[in-house]
Amino acid sequence: MNKILEVENLVFKYEKESDVNQLNGVSFSITKGEWVSIIGQNGSGKSTTARLIDGLFEEFEGKVKIDGELLTAENVWNLRRKIGMVFQNPDNQFVGATVEDDVAFGMENQGIPREEMIKRVDEALLAVNMLDFKTREPARLSGGQKQRVAVAGIIALRPEIIILDESTSMLDPTGRQEIMRVIHEIKEKYQLTVLSITHDLDEAASSDRILVMKAGEIIKEAAPSELFATSEDMVEIGLDVPFSSNLMKDLRKNGFDLPEKYLSEDELVELLADKLR
């Protein structure tokens, strides 16, 4: 399997003099084309891990390899071109006067020819269903629309990895679902690898694999079907379980014959529809 991201024994603290590490020996790898989510309580080290991978902090112990190449101070700018990061607040990412200017900004910094830029801007905005808004001012967009434009700005750069750092946490449920639908479509279209940092367990449930962090360490790694099968394990970690898990538990109490394994919302709807036909 082709490992596009490898993290080995990351140790990091924000203050050199501090006795407290934000990360304590974090290690994992991600295969090309995989969608991996990192979940955990506030302060567990999720976002710190993501930002170290993106080269936003220079001093740390351990190794980060991107597409087989070791991340160093000398090559950080070149390797960062392989990563696109979507942050929590889209307003913090806007720099252009119009939507199309903003999507083009990163490409201008990379010296991409103008003809190619125009082509990529339209292609990226079309992919996130925002082409009709390309001359609009970003400030006049809704939260969900702003985040879609932020995603367009990333995919226009043609990265190999997209990191979502709590990128849906400021959206309402409808906006959150729309953004996740768009990113899933883009992932398949461009064969991207996705690392998602999230508090939303329903969002994490659509991942290929989930890493659970606590106090700067990865304490569990599993597929969603395994991790969410029992609510007791999640409560012990200090987290909730996805909506479908709680619903299945209540339905069993009311006499529904349901499997013990975890089912996503779509899978549960399909199963219940079959039973009620």
UniProtKB/Swiss-Prot annotation:
Keyword Transport in annotation: yes
Main subcellular location of this protein, as a coarse class: membrane
GO molecular function, a single term: ATP binding
Gene3D superfamilies noted in UniProt: P-loop containing nucleotide triphosphate hydrolases
Topology with respect to the bilayer: Peripheral membrane protein
UniProt cross-references to SUPFAM superfamilies, sorted A to Z: P-loop containing nucleoside triphosphate hydrolases
PROSITE patterns in alphabetical order: ABC_TRANSPORTER_1, ABC_TRANSPORTER_2, CBIO
Compartment(s) of residence: Cell membrane
One GO CC term on file: ATP-binding cassette (ABC) transporter complex
Signal peptide: none
rRNA processing listed as a keyword: no
Coiled coil: none
Enzyme Commission no: 7.-.-.-
Segments forming domain ABC transporter: 5-240
Oligomeric and partner information: Forms a stable energy-coupling factor (ECF) transporter complex composed of 2 membrane-embedded substrate-binding proteins (S component), 2 ATP-binding proteins (A component) and 2 transmembrane proteins (T component).
Family, as annotated: Belongs to the ABC transporter superfamily. Energy-coupling factor EcfA family.
Function noted in UniProt: ATP-binding (A) component of a common energy-coupling factor (ECF) ABC-transporter complex. Unlike classic ABC transporters this ECF transporter provides the energy necessary to transport a number of different substrates.
Protein's recorded name: Energy-coupling factor transporter ATP-binding protein EcfA1
Provenance organism: Lactococcus lactis subsp. lactis (strain IL1403) (Streptococcus lactis)
